[in-house]
Each structure stands twice: as C-alpha cells, then as structure tokens.
Amino acid sequence: MEGRNAAAEPFVWVNSASAHSQSVAKAKYEFLFGKSEEKTPDSSDHGGSTLLPPTVTNEFPEYGTMEEGGEGLRASLDFDAKSPPCRLPGQQAVHLLAGQDSILNSVTEGPNDAPQCHPQEQSLQPIDSLISALKATEARIASGTFQATKVLDKDANFSVYQVDKELSTASHKPQRAHRTFPVGPGKSPDIPLSAEVPTEENLSLHIQEDLSALLPEEAQAHRSQITNYRRQGPLRVPESACPVSSSSAGSHNPVDRVGALREQRSDLGREHPRGYDRGGSMGRQGRIKHVEFQGVEILWTGEEAESRHPPERTASPVSKEFAKRPSHSSPACGVCSTSTHLTGDVWDETCKAPSERPGTSAGTLSPMPLGESGEDDVFLRESKEHLEENFAIQGDKERILDQEEHLRGDDDILGPGYTEDSTDVYSSQFETILDNTSLYYSAESLETLYSEPDSYFSFEMPLTPMIQQRIKEGGQFLERTSVGGQHDVLSVSADGGIVMGYSAGITNGLHDSANSVYTRGPQEIAFWGSRDRCFAEGKTTGVDAGSEMGSTDILEKETTESLSNGTNSNVEAAKRLAKRLYHLDRFKRSDVAKHLGKNNEFSKLVAEEYLKFFDFTGMTLDQSLRYFLKAFSLVGETQERERVLIHFSNRYFSCNPDTITSKDGVHCLTCAMMLLNTDLHGHVNIGKKMTCQEFITNLQGVNEGGDFSKDLLKALYNSIKNEKLEWAVDDEEKKKSPSEGTDEKANGTHPKTISRIGSTTNPFLDIPHDPNAAVYKSGFLARKIHADMDGKKTPRGKRGWKTFYAVLKGTVLYLQKDEYKPEKSLSDEDLKNAVSVHHALASKATDYEKKPNVFKLKTADWRVLLFQTQSPEEMQGWINKINCVAAVFSAPPFPAAIGSQKKFSRPLLPATTTKLSQEEQLKSHESKLKQITTELAEHRSYPPDKKVKAKDVDEYKLKDHYLEFEKTRYEIYVSVLKEGGKELLTTDGNEPVGLKKSHSSPSLNPDASPVTAKVKRNVSERKDHRPETPGIKQKVT
C-alpha cells in the first residue's frame, strides 16, 4: 500500500501553532518515533485517556488536548503510517495533523467539525485557510448559550469552528492518508504524553453524513441538548437531524467542552462508580453513541447503551429508540467508549476503550450509513499490522507505580478517576498470587488422597480487597492466547470468587460471529478466595451482549451447582480419606492424627467423617474415650491433639445427647481426664498426685456456669486412677529389637513396652534406660526406705531391710534380687527398685545406730534410703562413687518457679546428663555454691517472729534446711571435681575382687553377705525425716 514508508515524514506545523505547542509536540514526536524502545509514559487526556503498557495493542486510539486556536482539541489519537486510505467521496481530502482541531474534531469530537482527509499531492495551505476561516467564527460561537464550566488555560482562546463552507470548497478527490499522527500538545509539559500504541486488527469506522443539510439554526436549536448532558431516559433522534454537524451554531468552545466533561465525569463517577474508568468519562448522559464492530451495533444514549446485531448493516440507527441502560467502560471486555454524540445535528465520537483491552482483535468493518440523505459519505479506514506480544509482568508493575506516582501529583488537572489500567494491575497481581499458591493437603497423603482433575487447587491467601475491587470494576479479564482467536476470560462474583474460562470471541459482541458465546469448557478453572475450597466444572452459557460490563451478570446466570464452592467434591474426598484412615489402608496408626488435627476445612471434614465410624451410644465418657484411642495413636502437638478431642466430644454428644448438657461440657470433661491421666500416670510428675477431691474442685462452675455431678466425676476419677489411658501404637514399634528399645525381659522376648525405668510408683520414670552405660561400682547392699518423696515418712509395711545386688550403671543405681550376669536383662521388679542418683548426696548415716556400716542416700526429690555395706571401706567407696557420678553428670538446675504464692518450693532438678565440660561443670557448681551461701546468710538474718503462725515457722525451717543441704551438696561436688572428677570413676584396685564375688550366690558365701539379723524396731525409725524435726535434723547434719 502506498504511503507505508511515510512514518518518518518530517513533522509539519500549522501556522497558528505556538512555540510552546511546537516544542511539546516535537518532544512527543521524537519520543514516539525516535525512541520507541523506551517505556511509554502516561496519557495526558483529562478524562478520555487510559494508562497502557507498552506492549498492549490499541485498535481504538485515544484523544488528548490541544492548546491554542487550532490546537484546542485534546487529541491523543495516533494514526499509523501504514493505515489504509481515508476516503471522502465527492470531496477533497485534506491531510490530518495532530494539532488541527478543526479537522481532528470531526473524528474525535464530532459535534464541532466534519472529518476531512488530506491528499498526498497537495500542500497544507488549504488546512491553514480552513483554520483561519474557522477562527473567524470563534467570537460568534463563544457568545452562544453554552458557557465554559472550567477553563484549563486562562491565556488560551479556545473555540470551535464552523467548517461547512470550507468543506464545500475543499477538494473532492479521494486520497489515502499516509501520516502517523503525533500526539497533540497538552495543556502543560507536566502532563504525561500519550503513547502511540499499535493495533492488532484492521478497524474500519464508516461514517456517512450529509454535510449540505446542516444549518446553523438547527444546531442552535439543539444547544440545550448539549448542555443538558445529565438528562436521563431514552432519547429519540429526530428524523431531520443529520449525524454530523459542521455548523458553527452547533459547535462550542473546546475549553468549555473539556470543563464540562471534567465536571460530568465527577457526576457520573458518583452515579456509576463501577461503570466508568479513568478514560470512560467522555460519554455524556444526553449523548448517543453509535459504533459498529463486525456487524454488531453498539448504541449509547448517554447513560443508556444497547449492543445488538442488526439484521441489515444498512439500517439507520437514527430513528431507533433504545432501552435505558447505564453506560460504562470495561477494560476487560474492551467496550468502546467511543461516543457518537447526537444532539439534534451533533455527533460526538471518542474512540477510546479498546486501548485498555489487551489481546482484543477486531476485523475490518463494512461501511454503515449514519445519515439518511446519503449525498456525501465520509469514510475513515485504518489498517494496522498484526502484532502479538506477551505481557511483561515486572515491567508492568514498575510502569504502574510510576504512573500512580505521577498522576497523584496531577490530580488537580486530571480530576477524579482511575490512575491505572485495572486489567494490567490484576494481571501482574494475579501472576504473583499464582506463584504463591500451595495445596492444603498433608504431604503424606497427597498422592494417595484421591484422583481428581489437576484443576483442583486453592489460594493460600485470598485476593486483596484492592484486586477484588478492580476485578469487579473491570468485570472480565482478557489475556492474549496463542490459540487461534481464543481469550482467557476472568470474572469475579460478589463474594470474591473468580471464574476463568476461554471464549472464542469477546463477550460484548466484538467478533465475526453473530452471537458471541462465553464458553466454560474443560479448561476452565474456578478459583475461590476462601481457603481449602475449589472446584472446576465445564459449562456453556450465553452472555447478554448488552449486559453491564462492571457487573457480575455472567456469574449470576450460572446455576447454583456450578458455584457451590466445591463443597460436594471436598466432602466426597473427605469420605474416601476417612474410610482409608479408619481401615488403615496404606496408613499407619501414627498417621491418623496428622490428618485429623490440621487447622483447615478439609481436615475438619475428614475428622467428622472419621468419627462417624464410631458409635458411642450407651457408653460412658471414659469408655468411649478408651475405645476411640485404641484405634490410633494420639500424637502431635497440643493444639492438634485438642482438635481431635473436639471432634470426639462432638461425636459423643451426638450419640448421647442426654448424658451431658452440652458439647462444651463433654469436651471439658474429656480434657480433664487427659490431664488427670498425665497427673496420675505421667512420667514427668514427681510431686503429689491429684486426689479425687481436688479433681472435683478443679471442675467447679465449668459446666456452663454450673457443676458436674459429683458421682460422675468420682466415677471418672476412679476409672483413670485404676487404669491409665493408653492409645494404640504401630506394629513396627511393638516388634523392635532390644537394641532399638529396651532391655526388658518378658516371656523370653524383648518387645518395646517400657523404654524408661521404673513404674507408676517410681518418681524417676523420666530417666531413660541406657543399656550401654558404664558400670562404676557393684556389690551387695541391704536397703531400707526411710522417707518417700518430699521427706514424707514411709508407710510402716515398707520400711523393712531387703538385700539386693546393687549396680551403679551410669546415673542409675540398679537393685537386683538375683545374682548379677552381664547377659541377663533386668526384670520389671528390678526396674521398679532402680534409683537415680542425679543431684543426689550420699553420706554416712550418723543418726542411725542400730546397724553398722550404714550410709544415707538423699535423692533429688528428697527421698531418703539407708544402705548397709559389709565393711566401712566399702561404705566409703559407695559414698565416693555416688557423689562423683552426681557431681560429674548432674545438669544445672532450672530457675525457681515464679508465682503469687509465698509458699516455698524447691526448684526443679533436671534428670538429663549435663552437656558441660568438666571445667565448665566445676565453674557451674562453684557459682551455685556461692549463690546458695549468700541466700542462706540472708535467710538466717531475718528469723521469724515468735508471734507468727506455726505454718510460717515451718516454712522458714523448711527453706533453711533446703539451703543448708544444697550448700553441703555443692561443697562436696566442688571438692570431688577438684580432686579429679572423672578420674575418680575409674575402677579401684580392690574392685575386681568384689566383682568376682558378685558372680557367686549369696547363700554360698554367707560371710560376704550383709548382716541380716533381725533387730527390734526403734521408735525413732518411725519419725518423720522432715527437716522441721530438730532432733533428726541435728543428727543428719
């Protein structure tokens, strides 16, 4: 096509252009043609421009402003140099320039001018003469009834020109336009330039107008229609009115027009905040817009719009009456907010919105008559090359941020409106969100959960309110696809749901097909903001071409089944997973709790379905809990276990609604039983056990303000006390070898049933049994339990002397009834008698006079045991070894408890082995010794008054005894470590002899056995060994 190489044609100026306008236009021209690789800045239009990414194609260029005289029109329309001809049958065509208001207004601001085309072989003199002639009518037009509401430039003398005579004298030879139109200069250099955006498809806009029938009187009679641009209701176009007016009486000042449009945009933005974007405010309520795209007529009557498919392309829209429909501009659907403004004789066209819709393609349009006389037809055809470009997400983000920052500073010029392309913002944000999505299923069961389509996934985080608002305003999102003619359509519902599908055409009818169909095929994915809910379902539904673009009509027309948030799919999946968990189908017992205790909707569904396999009808609460815990291992974090128990409580209440008043009451008792089980049978509780009365007292007032039945609480307490709660373990753990578990001997096998020494009566259950620990000393010892935990006296039936073969192995003193054999495992009875020596102190029992060679061992929990040896040397050997082990391996104590009670309590002493080196351990003991000594001195400096209560005196004595004992213990620890520490743990020279004797039976060597003569009990033995007894305390120290 001729003229395709005219893109580099030098810029030609209108004689009346000012120097400032020329400089601005030059900068724009160089920017658009000389530096096309740079980032495209914002548009300068005050109400009809939209921010576009540099790669987005634009079939419908936008218009900006001009400054003085002929540049008064705000034009941002860019015609490519490769565009097809613009014909004027029977008239001479003139070459259009961006700075010519009188000519470009005919295309962009129809009420003022008639479109003209410039032949290539003629000069620009006819244009200058036209502008001069148009200026002559400025005063006459400016004096009309239409007044400016807002003036952009006080020094600019804006007017609209009459071109009927100039058009009649213009050349009638049709020619082709070859020039690319640079952006017209804006009001000030601060306003960003409008980008030249290449289009993808050929767009032919055919306008037929009767120029000879236009009279100034007719246009003058319709001025009131122009001014009354807020008029509502259907508008009927008079038959006598011509589509295009070139009369000076029907024109008005562009400044007045812009000011009115700015005011109108604010009004329309308030009336229809979702129907307008930043570039869609040019349409007036009293304006009729008529544009045909591929055989689809889009008719606008101010705020009324109708999109339809005419039976005949030659039908005239002038005599048609349209139903009332709000006007809007949707960047997603690419609605052309190009307005064909008809007020009697006046038509106003501003083709804008397609620049906002990336990937929109429109074919060449056939001519469509807009007038009835048909004497003169004006055709405007624009041809563009086919371009396909991909979005640059990061580049769009940076461009949008720059645009927002710039436009915030130009609010006084641009007025209210959107400052960025909502489609572009959403595309970048949407890609970012997709990158951060993940599945909510557990990692172990994801591959075995169920086989569903790949489209089932959900957002970890919901869409932000800003993105949701932009989606609702845009209505739909179109993204270019490589598939022929298909586009991604993304719509949002009122609840934040997003539906993506593929459409062979644009849903507002901009396609070759007579009826555009919105297809929801198998590729469609429905996203939901709420976590853990998703579904996809193929569906095909027709879309009303005239529906409001910013609304959610598309989703509202969907059936409720297709918008069920995927609940049905999740329920079915939860049922399948729950069934497999209950039957342990490719799951272990320890895996069940992981799937029931997660904090998401799907896990809750699985737990509810899992509990349906249990029937607790007629069972007591403790029986139901035991039955439930036998099915799986209740492991995991505390909150995960509690979630599982919540589901259990709900299920029990549904099966037994009359037993307990509420679900909360059931859950409260369930947790109370779990805590009671830990208190009575737990490994870490070495203090006083909870009594039944304390259990009842703790549950007062928690049954919805009332109390539970005491009989019920007593029954639950006795049930837990007599039989502790246990849950099932995996078969693999039961079959572990002794090297992996314990040295317990049971029926000749070594199943892992006890991994820690002792039993429920042994306070040192938290000490793991190490079969590989070193043996430091062994031999026969006679044991007598003198005091239980916290110094309480031992019951009378348990105070007798018993002979054991003792083995100091690691930090544990094992007491065996049978002879020692290294290959022999310890029995349950042996483990029950074991004593931990961490933080213990062994000393000679100076207060016990009934038997010789007796030493006393006071443990960390203040148990007191008496041991008798065969000789004084052996007694001292046991004392040294026990103290040395305690000094070397005892870890630093925990800080003292902080509470509101004034009652003294000893700090906890950890049973774990210290991780400090010997030097660090020595420093730790010395530091603790110094602290205890200082505290003891302060304590004794404030003795209790004689008038205080006896309870306070006992508290004082108890603390005094504790501090004194701790001081003595740390003094011995420090002295042991200074003497050598671990070196003292090596075997002495006389030790092998004792070890040899240990392999023989005590009955075969009665001389080596301790003296077992029966001694009459003394009253002093039955005394409490608590420190408050002065006599005992004096003897012990």
From Swiss-Prot:
Cross-referenced InterPro entries: PH-like_dom_sf (IPR011993), PH_9 (IPR041681), PH_domain (IPR001849), Sec7_C_sf (IPR023394), Sec7_dom (IPR000904), Sec7_dom_sf (IPR035999)
Residues in coiled coil: 911-941
One Pfam family cited in the UniProt record for this chain: PH_9
Bias kind Basic and acidic residues: ranges: 262-277, 730-747, 1018-1028
Primary location class: membrane
Record localization: Cell membrane; Cell projection, Ruffle membrane; Postsynaptic density
Segments of skewed composition (Low complexity): 237-251
GO annotation, cellular component aspect: glutamatergic synapse; membrane; postsynapse; postsynaptic density; ruffle membrane
Tissues and organs where the protein is expressed, per its UniProt entry: Ubiquitously expressed, with highest levels in liver. Present in brain, with highest levels in olfactory bulb, cortex, hippocampal pyramidal cell layer and cerebellar granule cell layer (at protein level).
Source superkingdom: Eukaryota
GO biological process, one term: regulation of ARF protein signal transduction
Function: Guanine nucleotide exchange factor for ARF6.
Listed name of the protein: PH and SEC7 domain-containing protein 3
